């Protein structure tokens, strides 16, 4: 990006958005086997490196006393964790760019995800060309939201309904995989066929390893989302849950390595197993960095106020709403509610009976007393509050 924000608050918000976009695209590049998408992650990594350098410089300049230095140390800890998350995204994308190999079973299993990221090029003469996003209604037409637009060398991350698309724009979207076919029709992009596992293969330990890795992907994404939520909300309970997720990821990696080695011993081609180990390592480290990010919250230490403010001003905000008796959402499944379309929120976790359900699937039914932890566009949080039978009051301070 040619003109980077120099304000620390703005840079932190951009770094959060960029790191999440990188992780989404990295996993998507594996799913689609798309080298172009993987290379986009590398380009974003260059932008992230510049942001991290600038943020560290600002923190050093701002620490003019021991008290200020202590406050800025928490900011630097978060900056370092964000940088490592971006590096993990690059490592995931290298599975594609370096052709490390990945079993088709994994790619097919990833297609069962409730939400995926996708990349599409806007062609000249397509339905999308020369039209504002608001008129396309992509959330309704395809069940997907535009997270960013790349126009030449410029990245547009503050996308809104007034953004007019032009031929050559590359859109990065997130939403239901069921909408990919319709999305590509609107962009006049080539037809895409979803991956399917090879027929007739005997799946034993490899099948188990793949299932674990898909769960690791889901938990690593949940850990990142819940960690940002814990920082914004200053919630020690959420921070502790990030720790539990990180421990689960550690255990899963141990199991996965064992099953991969057994699969190799059974005669499986080792070249297609390297990517599994590589992906597991990156997914585990995402959990490690999420925990590092919230360690101060978990310990009850004071955070610099700019963290909550900046991360709350990112393209996606974190919210936590109890489900009230008689509300619109009470008694409905997430699939029926389609919160990812309207008001555009992804449910990261549901707190229920003292525990958490992470990355809940569409069949999960909300009940009164549940607490929803979700992320989405700021303009949609009032509607989500209303659906939970709460009124969002504006801060007059």
Model-derived segments and spans:
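Cytosolic, long alpha-helical scaffolding segments
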Residues: 1-397
């Amino acid at each position: 990006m040619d003109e980077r924000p120099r304000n620390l608050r703005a840079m932190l918000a951009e770094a959060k958005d960029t790191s999440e976009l990188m992780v989404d695209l990295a996993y998507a590049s594996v799913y689609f086997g798309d080298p172009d998408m993987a290379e986009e992650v590398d380009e974003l990594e260059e932008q992230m490196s510049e942001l991290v350098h600038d943020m560290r410089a600002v923190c050093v300049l701002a620490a003019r006393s021991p008290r200020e230095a202590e406050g800025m140390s928490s900011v630097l800890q978060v900056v370092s964790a964000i940088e490592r998350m971006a590096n993990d995204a690059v490592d995931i994308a290298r599975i594609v760019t370096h052709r490390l190999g990945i079993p088709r079973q994994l790619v097919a299993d990833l297609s069962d995800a409730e939400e995926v990221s996708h990349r599409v090029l806007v062609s000249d003469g397509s339905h999308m060309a020369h039209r504002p996003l608001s008129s396309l209604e992509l959330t309704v037409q395809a069940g997907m939201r535009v997270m960013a637009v790349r126009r030449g060398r410029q990245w547009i991350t503050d996308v809104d309904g007034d953004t007019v698309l032009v031929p050559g724009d590359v859109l990065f979207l997130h939403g239901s995989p069921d909408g990919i076919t319709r999305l590509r029709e609107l962009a006049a992009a080539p037809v895409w066929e979803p991956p399917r596992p090879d027929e007739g293969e005997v799946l034993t330990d490899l099948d188990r390893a793949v299932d674990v890795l898909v769960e690791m992907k889901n938990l690593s994404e949940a850990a990142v989302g819940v960690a940002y939520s814990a920082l914004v909300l200053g919630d020690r309970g959420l921070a502790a849950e990030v720790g539990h997720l990180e421990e689960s990821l550690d255990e899963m990696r141990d199991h996965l390595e064992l099953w991969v080695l057994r699969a190799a011993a059974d005669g499986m081609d080792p070249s297609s197993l390297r990517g599994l180990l590589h992906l597991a390592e990156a997914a585990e480290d995402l959990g490690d960095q999420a925990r590092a990010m919230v360690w101060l919250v978990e310990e009850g230490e004071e955070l610099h106020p700019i963290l909550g403010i900046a991360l709350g001003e990112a393209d996606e905000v974190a919210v936590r709403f109890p489900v009230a008796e008689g509300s619109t959402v009470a008694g409905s499944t997430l699939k029926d509610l389609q919160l990812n379309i309207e008001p555009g929120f992804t449910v990261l976790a549901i707190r229920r009976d003292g525990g958490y359900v992470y990355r809940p699937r569409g069949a999960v039914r909300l009940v009164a007393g549940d607490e929803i932890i979700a992320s989405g566009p700021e303009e949609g949080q009032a509607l989500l509050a209303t659906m939970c039978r709460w009124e969002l009051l504006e801060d007059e301070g």
